[in-house]
Amino acid sequence: MINLLFAVIAYLIGSVSFAVVVSKVMGLPDPHSYGSGNPGATNVLRTGNKKAAIFTLIGDALKGLAAVLLAKHFGPAYGVDETGIALVALAVFLGHLFPLYHRFAGGKGVATAAGILFAIDPILGAGTLATWLIIAFFFRYSSLAALISAIFAPFFYVLMNGVDIMAGAILVISVLLIARHRANIAKLLAGKESRIGEKKKV
């Protein structure tokens, strides 16, 4: 029961959409109303406001990081076990994808997933981030970098820790992240996906 309680709290944390919050605070349009319609840092950047995009990126990553770290450090004292920590990781990610506060219209989860991975294991997070940076540098597609990183993340974890409940949670997160990039996959295959640095009008 305590595992589920912590998972619910994590979901509520994940439901805070920093793209929406930052946009409101900085007087920008609702990120659902322009570009890809995705409430994430990449879409916010299409307004031309780099600070807003950076704040969005940091906020989305920090909520994933904070939810898992808090559960890891304080949860055991209340009876939260490894299954509970895995549920928290999955729940905060689901909160980002389907936010309660924003009519369940959430983002794709790249930054939040990164925060979760760093909280689980800094080496895992760094390895996955390095994968993203390498793919992004050579191919200039943010979406492709995210997809490849999502594929490798579960393997990195298993190589380091073996197969356990957290490996299952990371696998589910990766599958969900890939599923959220369906439109990007179609554009990549059609050669129509935007490269990093290309600007789109809001």
Curated annotation (Swiss-Prot):
Keywords: Cell inner membrane, Cell membrane, Lipid biosynthesis, Lipid metabolism, Membrane, Phospholipid biosynthesis, Phospholipid metabolism, Transferase, Transmembrane, Transmembrane helix
EC number: 2.3.1.275
Signal peptide per UniProt: none
GO cellular component: plasma membrane
Pathway assigned in UniProt: Lipid metabolism; phospholipid metabolism
Keyword Transmembrane: yes
Gene Ontology biological process: phospholipid biosynthetic process
Family annotation (SMART domains): G3P_acyltransf
Disulfide bonds listed in the record: none
One of the Pfam families matching this protein, by short name: G3P_acyltransf
Subcellular location: Cell inner membrane
Catalysed reactions listed for this entry: an acyl phosphate + sn-glycerol 3-phosphate = a 1-acyl-sn-glycero-3-phosphate + phosphate
Transmembrane segments: 2-22, 51-71, 80-100, 116-136, 137-157, 158-178
Keyword check for Phosphoprotein: no
Matches recorded under InterPro entries: G3P_acylTferase_PlsY (IPR003811)
One example GO MF annotation: acyl-phosphate glycerol-3-phosphate acyltransferase activity
EC class name: transferase
Primary localisation category: membrane
Membrane topology (UniProt): Multi-pass membrane protein
Domain of life per record: Bacteria
Function text: Catalyzes the transfer of an acyl group from acyl-phosphate (acyl-PO(4)) to glycerol-3-phosphate (G3P) to form lysophosphatidic acid (LPA). This enzyme utilizes acyl-phosphate as fatty acyl donor, but not acyl-CoA or acyl-ACP.
Oligomer and partners: Probably interacts with PlsX.
Family membership: Belongs to the PlsY family.
PANTHER family linked: GLYCEROL-3-PHOSPHATE ACYLTRANSFERASE-RELATED, INNER MEMBRANE PROTEIN YGIH
Protein name: Glycerol-3-phosphate acyltransferase
Gene from which this protein is expressed: plsY
